[in-house]
């Protein structure tokens, strides 16, 4: 399709008539175009309403009427052809749209007329503005200009974005028909573009409004652009008039707002107005490049344009519309959607009025209309400026209210920053730390005050029972708290009955007696007398320390320090009695887990370590002392004493760590590192060959292995062994026993008959 549309030799299928015939048959082309346009509208019924279809047809008719002032047939043919061009090219470029399927039929019908008529007649109409007698030269220019337009329009078709509206007003008007595909939330912005469309009498603008979410800026941008398209249509060419304002921009008094700046402003407004659209960034970039290319391509056509006054008029109006769009973008960035919608609707109305005035001034070619047009546009811009200021004020007021209510905007992020600042220090940004939200301390104080007031007003004792206010404690609650504090020290009797009232007294008395006995033994040892006080008290101590219900109480009361006194050596460096050491080490093993603070303050660890390292200590006592030391030190190093929960790998690692250093070296291979057999077998590590470094050309003496084999090898004959074991365990089965009994009975029964006795003694049982 592109090759057919964009061929520069003006021949599509050979059915195209000469340019002069097209001029003569302009009305026929117009009728065909209106049919095709309505067909394309019906083809896009999925995206556009019937009202939009009627709007387009009315717009076409009005555009033809407005342009008939100079060249009736050429203008009608041109307008219709340019419109049909718009319908064809966007459909081809937007190959994804649903209209693409329907466009080829209408395209094939009107291709010759539309392609050649639009290009040639556009140029004719340009020249028609200057003089009606130059139409023959126009046909010559049409070929070259059609090539220029073709070069521009392939760019449009190649980029399937919504930006083609820029490269040509025709594309802008009809590329938005396929864009209705994209329209997902047309409800919000549809009314605005439709108002401007009905006023501007431009059929494509409803379509531009249909390209909502991604085109939502573009309804506005296409309004500013469609301001140009109606003028072009009034001036009998859409593709020609777009370069006219842009080329005149370079010559105008406001050169800084040339095509590039206009497109950039429109792009900026699009960025601001529609940040939600994902494709807006890519579209804007494409628009920039296409607009610049179009402006470069259309500069050649500027010589064909009519008076400079007509150029300056659409140029200034477009600049005003661009200013409005820039302000709209600022509004939508600063203000909320309501203010933006109001200003946009008014801007659309202003654009619509500007479009009407442009159609009139293009038809009349009068400078007075241009001046009135500019003044009307300036009035709309002034109104939009006031609206923008009001929207900005409203948005600033709303932002202040939000800050007063919810604190700063980044309050949620400040929590993490505050945490990091508390942990790692201040961040260094003093300005960011101006937190206007609520302080947690103030909130807690307000809560406490309100709760106090509620507690005073109400008769309930909920807060008092929770222990929040100690001033209101009753005698009963004080007694309960005292009981609860004492409950930790009391233990139940073995039978689970009543509390032992004298448990604490018994435990404390026992500890006092133990300390006294240890002190007396030290004094007797200093006097060179036998120290027998501990031995005499040992049975009583062992009896009480073995009671399960008193063990916790003993530990809490400080029995560990008393045991340390009993296990520590006497002043003459002699160990206490062997019986005392054995009994107390056994009791220490039976005691529940002891806290690190208790071990530290009591000093029991030093006493046990002294026994563990003492050369005269018995082997059994050393083993018990070593187990105690290991058990008490495991929590300090974060190790668990539950070996059942350990995996096999953990147990192997533990055994390797506890292995003596010499055996560990030998088990790992000694000084000579040995190759891993698995690596050798898998091929990762190749076996050494003669000539390789490290190869020894001699036989090796096999060395005994010092490794501890932890994993038992699997038994390969499990089934046979199980059968054998089962048979050996069960022995003779009941069936075998019954069979033997049966055979015995039969033998006996046989022997009951008469038996021939051999005289010689044969068959005699021995």
Swiss-Prot record:
<feature type="modified residue" description="Phosphothreonine">
    <location>
        <position position="381"/>
    </location>
</feature>
<keyword id="KW-0509">mRNA transport</keyword>
<feature type="modified residue" description="Phosphoserine">
    <location>
        <position position="277"/>
    </location>
</feature>
<feature type="compositionally biased region" description="Basic and acidic residues">
    <location>
        <begin position="85"/>
        <end position="102"/>
    </location>
</feature>
<feature type="modified residue" description="Phosphoserine">
    <location>
        <position position="460"/>
    </location>
</feature>
<feature type="modified residue" description="N-acetylmethionine">
    <location>
        <position position="1"/>
    </location>
</feature>
<keyword id="KW-0813">Transport</keyword>
<feature type="modified residue" description="Phosphoserine">
    <location>
        <position position="252"/>
    </location>
</feature>
<feature type="modified residue" description="Phosphoserine">
    <location>
        <position position="157"/>
    </location>
</feature>
<feature type="modified residue" description="Phosphoserine">
    <location>
        <position position="263"/>
    </location>
</feature>
<dbReference type="GO" id="GO:0051028">
    <property type="term" value="P:mRNA transport"/>
</dbReference>
<feature type="compositionally biased region" description="Basic and acidic residues">
    <location>
        <begin position="646"/>
        <end position="657"/>
    </location>
</feature>
<feature type="modified residue" description="Phosphoserine">
    <location>
        <position position="280"/>
    </location>
</feature>
<feature type="region of interest" description="Disordered">
    <location>
        <begin position="643"/>
        <end position="679"/>
    </location>
</feature>
<feature type="compositionally biased region" description="Basic and acidic residues">
    <location>
        <begin position="267"/>
        <end position="320"/>
    </location>
</feature>
<feature type="modified residue" description="Phosphoserine">
    <location>
        <position position="235"/>
    </location>
</feature>
<feature type="modified residue" description="Phosphoserine">
    <location>
        <position position="321"/>
    </location>
</feature>
<dbReference type="InterPro" id="IPR051037">
    <property type="entry name" value="RNAPII_TF_IWS1"/>
</dbReference>
<feature type="region of interest" description="Disordered">
    <location>
        <begin position="1"/>
        <end position="466"/>
    </location>
</feature>
<dbReference type="InterPro" id="IPR035441">
    <property type="entry name" value="TFIIS/LEDGF_dom_sf"/>
</dbReference>
<dbReference type="GO" id="GO:0010793">
    <property type="term" value="P:regulation of mRNA export from nucleus"/>
</dbReference>
<keyword id="KW-0539">Nucleus</keyword>
<feature type="modified residue" description="Phosphoserine">
    <location>
        <position position="261"/>
    </location>
</feature>
<feature type="modified residue" description="Phosphoserine">
    <location>
        <position position="183"/>
    </location>
</feature>
<dbReference type="GO" id="GO:0006397">
    <property type="term" value="P:mRNA processing"/>
</dbReference>
<feature type="modified residue" description="Phosphoserine">
    <location>
        <position position="209"/>
    </location>
</feature>
<feature type="modified residue" description="Phosphoserine">
    <location>
        <position position="366"/>
    </location>
</feature>
<feature type="modified residue" description="Phosphoserine">
    <location>
        <position position="211"/>
    </location>
</feature>
<dbReference type="GO" id="GO:0005654">
    <property type="term" value="C:nucleoplasm"/>
</dbReference>
<feature type="modified residue" description="Phosphoserine">
    <location>
        <position position="250"/>
    </location>
</feature>
<feature type="modified residue" description="Phosphoserine">
    <location>
        <position position="372"/>
    </location>
</feature>
<feature type="modified residue" description="Phosphoserine">
    <location>
        <position position="410"/>
    </location>
</feature>
<feature type="modified residue" description="Phosphoserine">
    <location>
        <position position="237"/>
    </location>
</feature>
<feature type="modified residue" description="Phosphoserine">
    <location>
        <position position="307"/>
    </location>
</feature>
<feature type="modified residue" description="Phosphoserine">
    <location>
        <position position="222"/>
    </location>
</feature>
<feature type="modified residue" description="Phosphoserine">
    <location>
        <position position="248"/>
    </location>
</feature>
<feature type="modified residue" description="Phosphoserine">
    <location>
        <position position="198"/>
    </location>
</feature>
<dbReference type="GO" id="GO:0001701">
    <property type="term" value="P:in utero embryonic development"/>
</dbReference>
<keyword id="KW-0007">Acetylation</keyword>
<feature type="short sequence motif" description="Integrase domain-binding motif (IBM)">
    <location>
        <begin position="416"/>
        <end position="442"/>
    </location>
</feature>
<feature type="modified residue" description="Phosphoserine">
    <location>
        <position position="368"/>
    </location>
</feature>
<feature type="modified residue" description="Phosphoserine">
    <location>
        <position position="224"/>
    </location>
</feature>
């Amino acid at each position: 399709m592109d090759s057919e549309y964009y061929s520069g030799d003006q021949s599509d299928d050979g059915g195209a008539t000469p340019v002069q015939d097209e001029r003569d048959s302009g009305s026929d082309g117009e009728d065909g175009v209106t049919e095709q346009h309505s067909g394309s509208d019906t083809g896009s019924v999925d995206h556009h309403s019937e009202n939009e279809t009627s709007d387009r047809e009315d717009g076409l008719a009005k555009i033809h009427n407005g342009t008939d002032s100079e060249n009736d047939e050429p203008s009608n043919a041109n307008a219709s052809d340019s419109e049909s061009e718009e319908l064809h090219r966007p459909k081809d470029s937007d190959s994804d749209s649903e209209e693409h399927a329907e466009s080829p039929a209408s395209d094939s019908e009107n291709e010759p007329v539309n392609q050649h008529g639009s290009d040639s007649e556009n140029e004719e109409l340009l020249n028609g503005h200057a003089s009606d007698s130059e139409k023959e030269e126009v046909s010559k220019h049409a070929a070259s200009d059609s090539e220029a337009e073709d070069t521009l329009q392939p760019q449009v078709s190649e980029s399937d974005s919504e930006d083609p509206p820029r490269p040509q007003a025709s594309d802008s008007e009809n590329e938005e028909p396929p864009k209705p595909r994209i329209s997902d939330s047309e409800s919000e912005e549809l009314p605005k573009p439709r108002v401007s469309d009905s006023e501007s009498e431009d059929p494509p603008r409803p379509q531009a409004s249909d390209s909502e979410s991604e085109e939502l800026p573009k309804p506005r941008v296409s309004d500013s652009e469609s301001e140009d398209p109606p003028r072009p249509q009034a001036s009998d060419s859409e593709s020609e008039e777009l370069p006219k304002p842009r080329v005149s921009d370079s010559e105008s008094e406001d050169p800084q707002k040339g095509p590039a700046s206009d497109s950039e402003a429109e792009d900026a407004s699009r960025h601001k107005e529609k940040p939600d659209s994902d494709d807006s960034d890519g579209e804007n970039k494409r628009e920039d490049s296409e607009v610049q290319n179009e402006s470069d391509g259309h500069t050649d056509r500027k010589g064909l344009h009519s008076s400079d006054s007509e150029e300056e008029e659409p140029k200034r109006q477009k600049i005003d519309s661009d200013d409005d769009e820039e302000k709209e973008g600022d509004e939508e960035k600063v203000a909320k959607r309501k203010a933006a919608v109001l200003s946009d609707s008014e801007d659309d109305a202003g654009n619509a009025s500007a479009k009407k005035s442009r159609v009139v001034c293009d038809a009349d070619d009068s400078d007075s209309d241009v001046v009135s047009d500019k003044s009307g546009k300036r009035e709309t811009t002034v109104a939009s400026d006031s609206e923008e200021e009001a929207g900005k004020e409203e948005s600033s007021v709303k932002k202040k209210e939000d800050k007063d209510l919810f604190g700063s905007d980044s309050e949620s992020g400040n929590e993490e920053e505050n945490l990091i600042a508390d942990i790692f220090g201040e961040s260094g940004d003093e300005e960011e730390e101006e937190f206007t939200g609520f302080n947690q301390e103030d909130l807690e104080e307000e809560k406490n005050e309100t709760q106090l007031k509620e507690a005073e007003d109400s008769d309930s004792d909920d807060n008092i029972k929770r222990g929040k206010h100690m001033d209101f404690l009753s005698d009963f609650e004080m007694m309960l708290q005292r009981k609860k504090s004492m409950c930790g020290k009391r233990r139940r009797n073995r039978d689970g009955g009543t509390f032992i009232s004298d448990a604490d007294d018994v435990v404390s008395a026992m500890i006092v007696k133990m300390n006294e006995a240890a002190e007396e033994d030290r004094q007797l040892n200093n006097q060179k007398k036998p120290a027998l006080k501990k031995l005499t008290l040992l049975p009583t101590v062992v009896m009480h320390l073995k009671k399960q219900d008193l063990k916790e109480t003993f530990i809490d009361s400080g029995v560990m320090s008393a045991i340390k006194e009993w296990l520590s050596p006497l002043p003459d460096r002699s160990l206490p009695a062997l019986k005392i050491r054995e009994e107390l080490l056994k009791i220490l093993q039976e005691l529940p887990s002891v806290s690190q603070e208790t071990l530290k303050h009591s000093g029991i660890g030093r006493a046990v370590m002294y026994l563990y390292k003492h050369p005269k200590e018995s082997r059994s006592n050393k083993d018990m002392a070593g187990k105690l030391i290991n058990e008490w030190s495991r929590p300090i190093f974060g190790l668990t004493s539950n070996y059942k929960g350990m995996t096999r790998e953990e147990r192997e690692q533990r055994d390797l760590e506890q292995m003596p250093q010499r055996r560990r070296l030998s088990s790992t291979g000694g000084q000579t590192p040995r190759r891993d057999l698995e690596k050798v077998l898998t091929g990762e590590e190749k076996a050494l060959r003669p000539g390789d470094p490290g190869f020894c050309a001699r036989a090796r003496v096999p060395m005994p292995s010092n490794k501890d084999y932890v994993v038992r090898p699997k038994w390969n004959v499990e089934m046979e062994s199980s059968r054998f074991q089962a048979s050996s365990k069960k022995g003779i089965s009941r069936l075998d026993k019954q069979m033997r009994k049966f055979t015995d009975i039969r033998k006996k029964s046989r022997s009951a008959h008469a038996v021939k006795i051999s005289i010689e003694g044969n068959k005699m049982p021995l």
